[in-house]
């Protein structure tokens, strides 16, 4: 083993992993931190890595790439896993894995490592990504190898090796937290009883609907080829647009869900997720599609969406089948242009208007008044032909 590239967050787990790799593999460890909008202090992360004698430190701002090339393509499909989950963690892993492999090539490393546990989905997502990008890469997953099986053992290891442990990490935390620009998730510990209501003071992106503004807020989102491009007619970059929607949605208590999901490894897991901006985008995108997509095209998208969501959730972003579905989805978005008006209030996203130069909606046809383009008597033959099999059951 020549050199290892570690996906490094600067937290207790990956700081211990960093030292453990240095001790057990006797080779140089390169650290890579992806700034995906998680609001961590990147200078502190650099200081922690430097204190552990790391010579090559890569801390990269990938927020725009994350939203433009991963989040937006996913939202073109109106992607939801098991009815609720907008895949905030799942969609971040392919980008981290890709860049980790690129850094391995750049630095001459033959091995990559991650801090995902042996029970979760992330170990699969990371490693599927690694092997798709470099089939010959070596992978180290410390949580599947070492004897440190509890948080207390991690803390003891850290203290023994002079790794700084913040005071608030010296006791058992109530939740395991993952964050990026799309969402923040809370899992484990007190949430492991699915009947116990969580302490919502932990929320970082949102307030609960009870504490949300008492005044509704109206916003407009513009779309070009299925992607949002402006809020209230002000053009914004992908990352800035999502960031602004998070701020707007958060103060109205939008996008807080409490779910029990089915992990790929076969375990049911309960989580609290905050996705304010993504929830607004999902409603807005569905609304603009409702007037710009043909019925059969829209229904076909609805049919393939669960398969597409499952591929992303299970870590198959870089596969041929996901790319095939993406090509179909992207083709459907060529005329998904226009503006959607929404009302945000106490946890609700209400579509109150939509318009498009590519609209397929005909007021003349939809009206209850008589129409020259639609003869009511024509419906009789349509009904008789389509009811033939029903009358012969």
From Swiss-Prot:
InterPro entries with a match to the protein in the record: Arginosuc_syn_C (IPR048268), Arginosuc_syn_N (IPR048267), Arginosuc_synth (IPR001518), Arginosuc_synth_CS (IPR018223), Arginosuc_synth_type_1_subfam (IPR023434), AS_cat/multimer_dom_body (IPR024074), Rossmann-like_a/b/a_fold (IPR014729)
List residues binding L-citrulline. 85, 90, 121, 125, 176, 185, 261, 273
Q: Hey, which pathway is this one from?
A: Amino-acid biosynthesis; L-arginine biosynthesis; L-arginine from L-ornithine and carbamoyl phosphate: step 2/3
Binding sites annotated in the UniProt record for ATP = 7-15, 34, 115
Location comes to:
Cytoplasm
**Residues noted as binding L-aspartate in the record, renumbered to the chain:** 117, 121-122
Q: How does it assemble?
A: Homotetramer.
Catalytic reactions of this protein = L-citrulline + L-aspartate + ATP = 2-(N(omega)-L-arginino)succinate + AMP + diphosphate + H(+)
Q: What is this protein called?
A: Argininosuccinate synthase
State the PROSITE patterns in the record: ARGININOSUCCIN_SYN_1, ARGININOSUCCIN_SYN_2
